[in-house]
C-alpha cells in the first residue's frame, strides 16, 4: 500500500482520535494532542458527510468542553486548522476557540 504524506497524516489523526474517543468514553480528560486530534477528526468526518465549512466552524465549538480536557488545554488550543476534502474540493477549516 502506497500512501501520500497527506494520507499518512490523516491516518495518524484518526488513530489519535480513536484513542481520544476511548479515553473520553472512560471519563478521562484529554491532553493537548488528543484534543486537537479529536477536533480534527470530527472536521474530516463532517466534511466527508457533506457538511459545509460554515457548519463545521459553528459545530466545532460544541464538540469539547472545558470539563473534558486537562487544565490549561483550552488556552493552548485557541485555533485548529485542518484541510478537509469536501464534495467540491479541498478546503481549510479553522476552528476558533473550539474548547469552551
Curated annotation (Swiss-Prot):
Temperature-activity note from the record: Optimum temperature is 45 degrees Celsius.
InterPro entries named among the record's database cross-references: Urease_gamma, Urease_gamma/gamma-beta_su, Urease_gamma_sf, Urease_subunit
Name of the top EC class for this enzyme: hydrolase
Gene Ontology biological process terms, A to Z: urea catabolic process
Superkingdom to which the source organism belongs: Bacteria
Enzyme Commission number: 3.5.1.5
Pathway(s) per entry: Nitrogen metabolism; urea degradation; CO(2) and NH(3) from urea (urease route): step 1/1
Alphabetical list of PANTHER family matching this protein: UREASE
Family recorded in the similarity comment: Belongs to the urease gamma subunit family.
Protein name: Urease subunit gamma
Encoding gene (name): ureA
Amino acid at each position: 500500500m502506497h500512501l501520500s504524506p497527506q494520507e499518512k497524516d490523516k491516518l495518524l489523526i484518526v488513530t489519535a482520535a480513536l484513542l481520544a474517543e476511548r479515553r473520553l468514553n472512560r471519563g478521562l480528560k484529554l491532553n493537548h494532542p488528543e484534543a486537537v486530534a479529536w477536533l480534527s477528526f470530527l472536521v474530516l468526518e463532517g466534511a466527508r458527510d457533506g457538511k459545509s465549512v460554515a457548519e463545521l466552524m459553528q459545530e466545532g465549538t460544541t464538540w469539547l468542553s472545558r470539563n473534558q480536557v486537562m487544565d490549561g488545554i483550552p488556552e493552548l488550543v485557541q485555533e485548529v486548522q485542518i484541510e478537509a476534502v469536501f464534495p467540491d474540493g479541498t478546503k481549510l477549516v479553522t476552528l476558533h476557540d473550539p474548547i469552551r
